[in-house]
């Protein structure tokens, strides 16, 4: 009977080399950054701040510090309303994204626009994002009392109603960490620019630190 010797050493070496290549490729795929589109107005755009101090760069840096591989795109337009956001949504999201942070409505409120219009426009935005299978983080805003209690209730409720209607992560109030101890009065001296409306770099940092965990949760949707 004739016996054959199977020389498996070179074969094993080849398999190991192939395995290393495959694992390296898989690691590269896992390392590909997820795209987050920050879609909003001047609060998103970084009005009045140095290029590295706005919401988008600070959020990107915070997420990277938590070990998240992400690319945060600045789709903020100063002065934008919910109607303006709806009008530009399709071309803004021409490229796919894993998560869209929706931060619109504050300019509608400043202009005294009907809260029902705010709700309708944001609903259409959320519908489009849902159709595109994009995860969302919806940021809420609170109306002022000087427009009357009814306006405030309707405006505040628009965001709450949307949050309850969609599979979204809801951050209830963009400025919630920038308020004084009463939770109502803005802490102007520490966290706001001279206009009293837009956060300074320290204010953005406080917002990002508080909102960051919500973003991480939304990325898991």
Write out the residue ranges for each language-model feature.
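Acidic/histidine-rich helix-loop elements
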Residues: 48, 73-81, 109-113, 196
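Bacterial N-terminal signal peptides
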Residues: 13-25
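Short, small-residue-enriched loops and turns at beta-alpha junctions
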Residues: 46, 79-80, 177-181
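Aromatic (phenylalanine/tyrosine) cluster motif
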Residues: 3-11
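Serine-esterase "nucleophile elbow" of acetyl-processing enzymes
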Residues: 29-78, 88-96
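Alpha-helical cap/lid subdomain in secreted, periplasmic
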Residues: 2-3, 68, 86-221
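Membrane-interface segments of envelope glycosyltransferases acting on lipid-linked substrates or membrane lipids
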Residues: 3-4, 20-23, 41
């Amino acid at each position: 009977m004739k016996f054959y010797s199977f020389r498996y050493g070179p074969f094993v070496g080849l398999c190991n080399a192939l395995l290393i290549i495959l694992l390296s490729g898989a690691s590269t795929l896992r390392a590909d950054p997820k795209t987050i589109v920050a879609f909003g107005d001047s609060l998103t755009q970084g009005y009045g701040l140095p290029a590295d101090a706005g919401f988008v760069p600070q959020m990107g840096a915070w997420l990277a510090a938590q070990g998240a591989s992400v690319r945060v795109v600045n789709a903020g337009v100063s002065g934008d309303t919910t109607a303006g956001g709806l009008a530009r949504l399709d071309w803004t999201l021409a490229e796919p994204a894993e998560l869209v942070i929706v931060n619109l409505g504050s300019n509608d409120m400043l202009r005294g626009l009907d809260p029902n219009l705010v709700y309708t426009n944001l609903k259409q935005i959320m519908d489009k994002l849902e159709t595109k299978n994009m995860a969302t983080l919806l940021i809420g805003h609170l109306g002022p009392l000087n427009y009357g209690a009814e306006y405030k209730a309707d405006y505040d409720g628009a965001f709450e109603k949307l949050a309850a209607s969609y599979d979204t992560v809801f951050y209830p109030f963009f400025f919630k960490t920038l308020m004084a101890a009463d939770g109502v009065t803005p802490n102007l001296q520490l966290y706001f620019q001279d206009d009293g409306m837009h956060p300074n770099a320290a204010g953005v940092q406080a917002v990002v630190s508080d909102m960051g965990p919500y973003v991480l949760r939304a990325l898991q949707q």
